[in-house]
Amino acid sequence: MGTVSSRRSWWPLPLLLLLLLLLGPAGARAQEDEDGDYEELVLALRSEEDGLAEAPEHGTTATFHRCAKDPWRLPGTYVVVLKEETHLSQSERTARRLQAQAARRGYLTKILHVFHGLLPGFLVKMSGDLLELALKLPHVDYIEEDSSVFAQSIPWNLERITPPRYRADEYQPPDGGSLVEVYLLDTSIQSDHREIEGRVMVTDFENVPEEDGTRFHRQASKCDSHGTHLAGVVSGRDAGVAKGASMRSLRVLNCQGKGTVSGTLIGLEFIRKSQLVQPVGPLVVLLPLAGGYSRVLNAACQRLARAGVVLVTAAGNFRDDACLYSPASAPEVITVGATNAQDQPVTLGTLGTNFGRCVDLFAPGEDIIGASSDCSTCFVSQSGTSQAAAHVAGIAAMMLSAEPELTLAELRQRLIHFSAKDVINEAWFPEDQRVLTPNLVAALPPSTHGAGWQLFCRTVWSAHSGPTRMATAVARCAPDEELLSCSSFSRSGKRRGERMEAQGGKLVCRAHNAFGGEGVYAIARCCLLPQANCSVHTAPPAEASMGTRVHCHQQGHVLTGCSSHWEVEDLGTHKPPVLRPRGQPNQCVGHREASIHASCCHAPGLECKVKEHGIPAPQEQVTVACEEGWTLTGCSALPGTSHVLGAYAVDNTCVVRSRDVSTTGSTSEGAVTAVAICCRSRHLAQASQELQ
């Protein structure tokens, strides 16, 4: 050790000692190992830094993400997400390599947590100057700066103590959720409150940031307020929804109702590990919080959902598009907006419930009575999308208790199907969000009898494509759902149609913007169709006066949807696509210069038919609905000279939108016809006849 090679210099001893203190999990194990050798550890770190055998794969570039809302950012703490197949040992080695390379450059780092079980990666405290270095490490997929998440109820100082409004004998659900366990990620809770005593287990999990401000006092009743109230809404004895459900609480929000993305991630990882160690029945995770859009938080929710866990979250209280927030924007999460006693959107001062295509449904969220942390028998009213999400978590617990084998897709479809329809005043929402926001208020199903034979479908909107000439938008169904039809919508009316195509082993709906257009939406009709065999048949432009035609030619396959798009554009000289099954219900007919696509499915007992409704004079909106017992699977338009903006499904109704009638004239040539394809299960029809 007395001589130093000119090619390899030793680090100063004080720096090495400091580095050992900050090495994180790997370093801690080395320090605790009585046989560990100080010099060997240093040499190992130097070797890992200098040896660059594990270079990043060619053609792959790690990306950096941070919250779009600057006040919510937490610079200096980063979640490093590694590629999906990365093992724990590789995660730890990557973390050590980052520390070694940072130390050589004179930077100190601290590994706060190594993720394992939910997603591979680690949480590191380091200077932002090291981001470029970290992004070049092997196995790194992307890095996200940590950010804040917040409880989604009004502040505690606006609450008012109220005597209980409900009596136990007034609300008797068919199943209390006794077979379901609900995890609540929130503040601490007052577990000895009479509403939830014996129903909630407080875990030892806690990952919260320090409270803001030096004068903040951690008064127990304020620290427990949000979590106690929500636990009471979910399963309280008097004011709870699922009175039989058991709960486990994890503390991820501090006394001010503030947490972090990283703390929430570690909480979700805790749930996944608990699930693996001790498998139980159906699990519901309630996330009554919101932060800025987070790729890593959405990814963690996706992993947990695909492990069979139902996640329910608050849409957010920012009177904004829910797609801008996480976890509300995660497709695998059931996102809930808030309504009041009149089924209208909740207003909270200058703000209010979030809205938009990422919201699945709404639920009661204003002046909700629940357990108060002020005393063990006190009640309080609180408002917000947290309370709305708690209602849906309770409903989900009861539905899962009645049918424990339900998948997330089946549960979501049932929640939508049994909701109260078209009761919300859409004028409250911004004009550009009205068509995207579901007009649904959650309700308990009257009975699960016969639901297994019901054909459930929902409408999924894509994000807006943007205005560029070749822009496209893509709408996707959940993994357990079948895409039965595809349509498109453009506020300017300039679009090149839509088509169904395979992507990643699943069919997706892709819509095409047109020259001079302002952007387009793709609209997927996603259905539960067990044992289905579905395919898309395409006919290229026929260039014949009779138009382009395509049909379901396979034996036993029925037509569930039609779509059409232009391969090239002729600056608007083409007519809009004509989609009309004529004569037999298994044929799509379109313009001779368009490609026509038919969605054809074979499933036990499936039968379909076509319904049309036309208005001789031009109208801004034309609709046609399927009868009771039938489910809308396809929605398209048969236009004349009117400029059709698009067609889309709202519940069981096909809606065709056109330009303002003042710009289209009033001749019969401007007539528009809405074309619906309605399907049902013969098993359900037979069961209904037997009941009658």
Curated annotation (Swiss-Prot):
Organs and tissues of expression: Expressed in neuro-epithelioma, colon carcinoma, hepatic and pancreatic cell lines, and in Schwann cells.
Propeptide residue intervals: 31-152
Disease implicated: Hypercholesterolemia, familial, 3: A form of hypercholesterolemia, a disorder of lipoprotein metabolism characterized by elevated serum low-density lipoprotein (LDL) cholesterol levels, which result in excess deposition of cholesterol in tissues and leads to xanthelasma, xanthomas, accelerated atherosclerosis and increased risk of premature coronary heart disease. FHCL3 inheritance is autosomal dominant.
Domain topic, free-text comment: The C-terminal domain (CRD) is essential for the LDLR-binding and degrading activities.
Region (C-terminal domain): 450-692
Any Pfam family hit: Peptidase_S8
Residues annotated as glycosylated: 533
GO cellular component assignments: cell surface; COPII-coated ER to Golgi transport vesicle; cytoplasm; early endosome; endolysosome membrane; endoplasmic reticulum; endoplasmic reticulum lumen; extracellular region
Name listed for the protein in its UniProt record: Proprotein convertase subtilisin/kexin type 9
Catalytic residues (positions): 186, 226, 386
Source organism: Homo sapiens
Activity control: Its proteolytic activity is autoinhibited by the non-covalent binding of the propeptide to the catalytic domain. Inhibited by EGTA.
UniProt-listed SUPFAM superfamilies: Protease propeptides/inhibitors, Subtilisin-like
EC number: 3.4.21.-
Role this protein plays: Crucial player in the regulation of plasma cholesterol homeostasis. Binds to low-density lipid receptor family members: low density lipoprotein receptor (LDLR), very low density lipoprotein receptor (VLDLR), apolipoprotein E receptor (LRP1/APOER) and apolipoprotein receptor 2 (LRP8/APOER2), and promotes their degradation in intracellular acidic compartments. Acts via a non-proteolytic mechanism to enhance the degradation of the hepatic LDLR through a clathrin LDLRAP1/ARH-mediated pathway.
Keywords associated with the record: Apoptosis, Autocatalytic cleavage, Calcium, Cholesterol metabolism, Cytoplasm, Disease variant, Disulfide bond, Endoplasmic reticulum, Endosome, Glycoprotein, Golgi apparatus, Hydrolase, Lipid metabolism, Lysosome, Phosphoprotein, Protease, Secreted, Serine protease, Signal, Steroid metabolism, Sterol metabolism, Sulfation, Zymogen
Mod. after translation: Cleavage by furin and PCSK5 generates a truncated inactive protein that is unable to induce LDLR degradation.
GO molecular function, one term: very-low-density lipoprotein particle receptor binding
Main localisation: cytoplasm
Domain Inhibitor I9, chain residue ranges per copy: 77-149
